[in-house]
Amino acid sequence: MYSGRSGAPPPAHSPYPNSYNHGPPGHSAGHNVPPPPPTQPVQFGHGAPQGYSFQYSNCTGKRKALLIGINYFGQRGQLRGCINDVKNMSTYLNQNFGYAREDMVILTDDQQNPMSQPTKANILRAMHWLVKDARPNDSLFFHYSGHGGQTKDLDGDEEDGNDEVIYPVDFRSAGHIVDDEMHRIMVKSLLPGVRLTAIFDSCHSGSALDLPYIYSTQGILKEPNLAKEAGQGLLSVVSAYARGDVSGMLSTVGGLIKKATSGDASHSKARQTKTSPADVIMWSGSKDNQTSQDATIAGEATGAMSWAFITALKKNPQQSYVQLLRSIRDELATKYSQKPQLSCSHPLNTDLLYVM
């Protein structure tokens, strides 16, 4: 359906300052540039089995982007700024990070082509396209601006009892898309060293990709108990997958299912950990119990999170993760009450240079 990725990876000295080890040295709005991400696998630690590791991406490989903006024209709860968010983000990614227009899929509800409408079927198809054939050090980008919400959690993996959802333009007939499904498509399949950057400018978006590590400007908010999960056999599936041991993975899954269906209470809610050997980062515009703002900034309707992310990076393109999180918070604080969050598929050294 969608064209493949075109062009060679950026050259060794990329003009894009947020690729690993690129850009003018020492430039960071008067400060030293934070250290780049390590190039070797990093152990999860925190009680995880020895050898259970993840890999940061240096973001020098191929680039693909999926951008979704839904204004819900003619529907109750119509929004004004979501399509503008996508236009602004696509221009920013193209001009500042080397994402080619032909390697972007844009789904907005002002387009005439039915395949470019943000329907549930088109969104799911595009999610599969985004992660297809991804390789280590590729940089994938996912952006959603539209309505978000919550629905009752059916698999027991949410602390508040609710799954986070997004609403396609045809949600009244086709239904919503649940965070579990987005995680399965866009996170679970990624190899070590593949970067997926996601931005959700929607209500109840704090855990929209079901990533287990959550950070705020104050530090870490949430992290999984890997020692407990390892004791339940929940990490062995991922460990086998990382080793390429498909038979081991299947036997582990089979064992978990057998235990879960045999009435063993301790395994009745056994589920695979949501950690990943890949490098998945998510910026969200609100915690799960907050609502995001559809705003007017400089005379243009826009989503507050999308605007703050672009504004903060334009002012200083070489910040650490925690510096960028604070910069986004400071931009939002001038106009809004919502608090930004950073979620990750692995434990994150927030003092490293943010690359994309």
Swiss-Prot record:
EC numbers, comma separated: 3.4.22.-
GO biological process: apoptotic process; proteolysis
Sample GO molecular function, one term: cysteine-type endopeptidase activity
UniProt-listed InterPro entries: Caspase-like_dom_sf, Metacaspase, Pept_C14_caspase
SUPFAM superfamilies: Caspase-like
Family: Belongs to the peptidase C14B family.
Functional note: Involved in cell death (apoptosis).
Name this polypeptide is given: Metacaspase-1
Organism: Ajellomyces capsulatus (strain NAm1 / WU24)
